[in-house]
């Protein structure tokens, strides 16, 4: 039997951040996504076998909860995505060891070879790399030299919704 999508959560050693797999796409492709004029990376699989690839792609999301007085986590994520757009004209791709890539190395997405450490905060990128090596222990080959890292994918979540005593929000409708 084949397992289509694994949900794996890892706690990093240094900061105890939670890193999780998201949106696994066996035989999938990496694609650009445009949200409010910001180009980010995403992925999907096709049902049509003619569109299958030899690759599996998935996102690794690092959960970050900020302390007071910080209130704009969506703005923080958006600024990281905008920095990727500024440095790479959109999505940046690098291999696991950070060497320069050729066009032949980039299989399914038009992306700019670059250095994600110039875009992502160290703590977040370290968590992603640590998770990849942890995944390699249960899925050998995950941390190979031909593993490509695309960035950035940002998910925007509102962690709290204000409700009244009737469990209703201020938004009517």
Which residue stretches match the model-derived regions?
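Residues forming the flavin
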Residues: 1-173
């Amino acid at each position: 039997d084949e397992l289509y999508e694994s949900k794996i959560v890892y706690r990093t050693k240094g900061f105890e951040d939670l890193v999780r797999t998201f949106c696994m796409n066996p035989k999938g492709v990496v694609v650009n996504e445009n949200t409010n004029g910001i180009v980010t990376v995403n992925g999907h699989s096709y049902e049509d076998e003619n569109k299958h690839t030899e690759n599996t792609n998935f996102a690794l999301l690092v959960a970050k909860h900020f302390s007071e007085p910080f209130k704009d986590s969506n703005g923080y994520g958006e600024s990281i995505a905008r920095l990727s757009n500024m440095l790479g004209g959109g999505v940046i791709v690098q291999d696991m060891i950070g060497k320069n890539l050729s066009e032949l190395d980039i299989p399914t997405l038009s992306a700019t070879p670059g250095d994600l450490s110039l875009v992502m905060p160290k703590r977040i990128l370290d968590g992603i790399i640590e998770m990849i090596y942890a995944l390699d222990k249960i899925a050998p080959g995950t941390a190979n030299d031909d593993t490509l890292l695309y960035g950035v994918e940002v998910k925007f979540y509102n962690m709290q919704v204000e409700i009244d005593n009737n469990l209703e929000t201020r938004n009517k409708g």
